[in-house]
Curated annotation (Swiss-Prot):
The keyword Transport does not apply. It comes from Moorella thermoacetica (strain ATCC 39073 / JCM 9320). Participates in chromosomal partition during cell division. May act via the formation of a condensin-like complex containing Smc and ScpA that pull DNA away from mid-cell into both cell halves. Signal peptide: none annotated. Residues 169-195 are annotated as: Disordered. It is found in: Cytoplasm. One of its GO terms (biological process) is DNA replication. NCBIfam families: SMC-Scp complex subunit ScpB. The gene is scpB. Homodimer. Homodimerization may be required to stabilize the binding of ScpA to the Smc head domains. Component of a cohesin-like complex composed of ScpA, ScpB and the Smc homodimer, in which ScpA and ScpB bind to the head domain of Smc. The presence of the three proteins is required for the association of the complex with DNA. Keywords: Cell cycle, Cell division, Chromosome partition, Cytoplasm. This is Segregation and condensation protein B. Coiled coil: none annotated. One of its GO terms (cellular component) is cytoplasm. InterPro entries: ScpB_csome_segregation, WH-like_DNA-bd_sf, WH_DNA-bd_sf.
Length: 195
């Protein structure tokens, strides 16, 4: 792929993604760089191509409607050895509630409780405090209950570009059934384990 942009613009994009520490929207990057949003996509592709060609330890990923600089997965063990992160795990109840929100959003607390068969107040507050879920409006129904949906941090947490990358519900149900038949308790696909 031929390079169309100057080294300065690619370097500027690299700097912005480095200092951001998380996903940055295409519109924000375009405004900072003084280019069109489509140019940001091209710049990111060029930068990623350079990283791949030079076998760097970093990559540029499309995440949550923008771009993020992150380490390549094959070097994760080195990063873990240095940082020894203690990521707070989500309980099974939190994962179940989060799955309901992700697949049915916007959804009310009452709808979540109906599906789960138990109260979700504590779990919902945990998901909100971790920035994975947010209020997204009010339902046009008596009492105007609050509607909840996922956040860009949810996409980042699960490494998704957008909600379309969620596995189809049929695949999730089949995975749960296969796990139970094999004697397991079932788990959410893409999750390393449970609490």
């Amino acid at each position: 792929m031929p390079l169309f942009f100057s080294d300065n613009l690619r370097a500027a994009l690299e700097c912005l993604l480095f200092v951001a520490g998380g996903p940055v929207s295409v519109d924000s990057l375009a405004a900072c760089l003084g280019v069109k949003p489509g140019d940001v996509d091209e710049l990111a592709a060029e930068l990623q191509e350079l990283y791949a060609r030079e076998e760097r330890g970093l990559q540029i990923r499309a995440v949550a409607g923008g771009y993020q600089m992150c380490t390549r997965p094959e070097f994760a063990s080195y990063c873990e050895a240095l940082l020894r992160p203690e990521l707070p795990a989500l309980s099974r109840a939190a994962l179940e509630t989060l799955a309901i929100i992700a697949y049915r959003q916007p959804v009310t607390r009452t709808e979540m409780e109906y599906i789960r068969g138990v109260k979700v107040d504590g779990v919902l507050n945990t998901l909100i405090s971790r920035g994975l879920v947010q209020e997204v409006g009010r339902k046009e129904a008596p009492g105007r209950p609050i509607l909840y949906g996922t956040t860009p941090k949810f996409l980042e947490f699960f490494g998704l570009k957008d909600l379309k990358e969620l596995p189809p519900l049929e695949d999730v149900a089949a995975s749960q059934e296969n796990s139970r038949e094999a004697g397991g308790r079932g788990s959410i696909p893409g999750h390393p384990g449970e609490e």
